[in-house]
A protein has these predicted regions:
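N-terminal, positively charged/glycine-rich alpha-helical extensions of SAM-dependent methyltransferases
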Residues: 1-28, 176, 187
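C-terminal alpha-helical "lid/dimerization" subdomain adjacent to the S-adenosyl-L-methionine
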Residues: 15, 158, 162-213, 217, ...
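Conserved alpha-helix/loop element of class I SAM-dependent methyltransferases that forms part
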Residues: 26, 36-59
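Hydrophobic beta-strand segment of the Class I
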Residues: 27, 126-127
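Class I SAM-dependent methyltransferase SAM/SAH-binding core
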Residues: 60-115
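A short acidic, Gly/Pro-enriched loop at the edge of an enzyme's catalytic core
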Residues: 114-125
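A short glycine-rich, Lys/Arg-flanked "PGG" loop and its adjoining helix->strand segment in the class I
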Residues: 139-151
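Core SAM-dependent methyltransferase catalytic element
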Residues: 217-244
Length: 244
């Protein structure tokens, strides 16, 4: 049974990796256009949540599922901490490396978020933006993020979410499931990728459920805030003790 589960998760990861590889070149353009540039503000909020860590010269922050590096670069602005980005999709990392060549000093490492190549307790902060819902197993993914955090280290999760207000939720759902895939498909050449997006968000835990899942996987002081009416949410939690 476990073997079947592992095979299913591996197939999911490969499909997601291949999908992002196919849209890597236009990923940033579509992100900014389809979100009306609101995604930039959301990333700044992630950096603000980690400001006390980013201001420390002895700190290291890991940006997991960093994609084309937008959040890594935002974290790096005016930071004294060392930022490291990881992603399992090489074409996305190639775009990140191009941006990095413009002056930032961020190591980008090809790595799967489910099996990070770092020792236990390596990082003061960990971020994952628009990546957690793409993992094949949310619980195991959160456990892995917990593992690489130091005691009292902070995890910040930025993710597409579920608007709490019924009327807005219905309107947004129509845009997200009917309009966005058509626009995304036309611009990127892959409608499948932008049909996957609303499907993956639908399957992702609602805000309070994600709080519960984070608490169950070793995080304390878990909190969240809805962004832009709840179309995205920012969750954070602190690792207190290692999981048994």
């Amino acid at each position: 049974m476990q073997t079947q589960a592992n095979a299913k998760e591996a197939a999911h990861s490969k499909a997601v990796r291949d999908m992002f590889a196919g849209i890597a070149g236009r990923y940033d353009l579509l992100n900014h256009v389809l979100s009306l540039n609101i995604d930039r503000r959301w990333r700044r909020l992630v950096a603000n949540e980690l400001r006390d860590i980013l201001d420390r010269g002895d700190a290291t922050v890991l940006d997991v599922a960093c994609g084309t590096g937008d959040l890594s670069l935002e974290l790096n602005k005016n930071a004294k901490a060392q930022i490291i980005g990881t992603d399992f999709c090489r074409p996305m990392l190639a775009v990140a490396a191009e941006k990095n060549s413009l002056g930032a000093d961020i190591p980008f490492v090809e790595a799967d978020a489910m099996t990070l190549p770092f020792a236990d307790g390596s990082f003061d902060g960990v971020t994952i933006a628009f990546g957690l819902r793409n993992l094949p197993n949310f619980e195991n993914g959160l456990k892995e993020l917990n593992r690489v955090l130091k005691r009292n280290g902070k995890l910040v999760v930025l993710e597409c979410s579920h608007p709490p207000f019924p009327v807005f939720r219905q309107l947004y759902s129509f845009y997200f499931s009917r309009v966005l895939p058509r626009i995304g498909g036309l611009v990127s050449g892959s409608r499948r990728a932008y049909e996957y997006l609303p499907d993956s968000v639908t399957k992702f835990p609602e805000q309070e459920k994600l709080v519960e899942l984070m608490e169950a996987t070793g995080f304390d002081r878990v909190k969240y805030q809805n962004l832009t009416g709840g179309i995205a949410a920012l969750h954070s939690g602190v690792r207190v003790e290692a999981l048994a």
